A protein has these predicted regions:
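Short, charged surface segments at domain edges that flank catalytic/cofactor-binding sites
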Residues: 83-134, 160
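Short, non-ligating residues that shape and space the ligands of small metal-coordination modules
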Residues: 141-142, 178-181
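Eukaryotic intrinsically disordered, low-complexity, charge-rich
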Residues: 46-100
Length: 199
């Protein structure tokens, strides 16, 4: 067989990942001395300190993605109906922007003229409908757990520039951290790639 007729194969493991609460033999620790077994548990997510404040009085309905989209629409249109959630969202956006500014200053990327502001971030969240640019999952603007993988973040398209208008996309924290320095369109392609299994 010549080079041009060679078939290249890619092996892909299509075994579905375990869901929370599922175990296999590797997760069970038999304690022969006491005649029982214990199942290793995943660590319990740590609650953010802000959830203990009086201002954090949200029901599970308030934290649903559809409600969070509604709050962003209210902030974007400047017709605020749900005053408390919108106020907390604005405070959190400001805190994140201050963190991004500190990162940019430290790296020498800060440009006060171009740096993203509150209005710009709200517009981006509204335009993205609170979806991650890469994985297309819903991002959370209100979240209870520390290091919540689906919390919203601003990912820089070009990592040699700051968190500037025109250089940002809305991304979940998981995708933002995973992408690192990979070209943004290439990373988006890998996140949206669908592998079809043929029989």
């Amino acid at each position: 067989m010549n080079e041009s007729n060679t078939i290249k194969r890619i092996n892909v493991d299509l075994t579905p990942p375990k869901k929370a609460g599922e175990t296999d033999d590797n997760d069970i620790d038999m304690d022969a001395g006491h005649g029982h077994c214990t199942v290793q548990c995943a660590t319990v997510p740590k609650k953010r300190s802000v959830t203990a404040l009086d201002s954090w009085q949200f029901s599970s309905t308030d934290l649903e993605p559809d409600m969070q989209r509604t709050y962003i629409k209210e902030l974007h249109s400047k017709i605020v109906v749900a005053n408390q959630p919108c106020k907390v969202i604005q405070q959190h956006i400001m805190q994140k922007l201050n963190g991004y500014k500190a990162q940019d200053v430290k790296k020498g990327f800060h440009d006060p003229e171009k740096f993203a502001d509150m209005e710009y971030v709200i517009q981006m969240l509204e335009e993205s409908a609170n979806f991650c640019y890469y994985c297309k999952d819903t991002v959370r603007v209100l979240y209870e757990n520390v290091r919540e993988p689906k919390q919203w973040s601003l990912d820089r398209i070009y990592n040699n520039q700051g968190h500037n208008k025109g250089n940002l996309v809305i991304a979940c924290l998981k995708c933002n951290v995973s992408r690192k320095t990979m070209y943004h369109e290439r990373y988006a392609f890998t996140k949206q790639l669908v592998i079809v299994k043929q029989n």
